[in-house]
Amino acid sequence: MLTFQQMILTLQAYWDRQGCALLQPIDLEVGAGTSHVHTFLRAIGPEPWRAAYVQPSRRPKDGRYGENPNRLQHYYQYQVVLKPAPENILELYLGSLEALGLDLKQNDIRFVEDDWENPTLGAWGLGWEVWLNGMEVTQFTYFQQVGGIDCKPITGEITYGIERLAMYLQKVENIYDLVWTEWQENGETRRLTYGDVYHQNEVEQSTYNFEHSNTEILFRHFAEHESEAKRLMGDTGEKAEGAQEKAAGTRLALPAYEQVLKAAHTFNLLDARGAISVTERAAYIGRIRNLSRQVAQAYYDSREALGFPMCKTEARA
């Protein structure tokens, strides 16, 4: 039996053999691996890219106080990004399942059409859910647009739901019973479970998300992150002659994107708290999307100004 951490190590080794850079998770709260700078921004422009990483993901509304056996407000995704998407991407994915010990002939693996969209990132793609014996374990996406910019070439994204896949491999019904790791000590097998690591976190974070987050502070933080992102994009709000031109020459896409991610997580906390109405929700999503598009364009422009250097690297190779 593969432990939870052995699963991750196996996927790391497999995708390393496929030429992926094994990266670390982004050190900010995000709702999915797609929000990582090395997926969202790297999907923009012509430069090739192959990367894989684990991404802790937070979705405050999904918290259930640690009482639901398969629903969490904090969980893990294993993210693989291949640009351009190789013709054999499905075969590569199935190979990763075999590396995890799955017999493809003995299991019902289905690709169910499910196109993907992330409104806050101004991103969408064509894709499939992957069902393993009736349970969704992976999302496949061919990015068509990111930040409102057409993807040329197309980026292929594979997002594994690590906990769900582990539940099947370990044959457990409750996520908290997953074996995170096990070892021998004094002749006995010792185990650390998912619940040992994260159950208290689910209880307390759910309590915070739904009951104790300070909405006044969160609204202020959202406005601050939005304002800072705009400033870093050269939108100073000043009308003085030359002010906008000066600011436009110092657009900082990467720091601005971090502010966008912070604004997005703050919005998710407010949404979980029930502090945003249905009509306000659409407006907030639109504000974040507009920022994402500005960042995407600024990043594209900066790479273009550099001559898309990774295209040259690939040509030399």
Curated annotation (Swiss-Prot):
Alphabetized InterPro entries for the sequence: aa-tRNA-synth_II/BPL/LPL (IPR045864), Gly-tRNA-synth_heterodimer (IPR006194), Gly-tRNA_ligase_asu (IPR002310)
Pfam families per record: tRNA-synt_2e (PF02091)
Main location group: cytoplasm
GO cellular component: cytosol
Superkingdom of this protein's organism: Bacteria
Disulphide bridges, residue numbers: none
Single GO BP term: glycyl-tRNA aminoacylation
SUPFAM superfamilies for this protein: Class II aaRS and biotin synthetases
Bilayer-spanning residue ranges: none
Keywords recorded for this protein, A-Z: Aminoacyl-tRNA synthetase, ATP-binding, Cytoplasm, Ligase, Nucleotide-binding, Protein biosynthesis
Reaction catalysed by this enzyme: tRNA(Gly) + glycine + ATP = glycyl-tRNA(Gly) + AMP + diphosphate
Assigned EC number: 6.1.1.14
Listed GO MF terms: ATP binding; glycine-tRNA ligase activity
Family, per entry: Belongs to the class-II aminoacyl-tRNA synthetase family.
Subunit structure: Tetramer of two alpha and two beta subunits.
PANTHER family membership: GLYCINE--TRNA LIGASE, CHLOROPLASTIC_MITOCHONDRIAL 2, GLYCYL-TRNA SYNTHETASE
Name used for this protein in its record: Glycine--tRNA ligase alpha subunit
Source organism: Cupriavidus metallidurans (strain ATCC 43123 / DSM 2839 / NBRC 102507 / CH34)
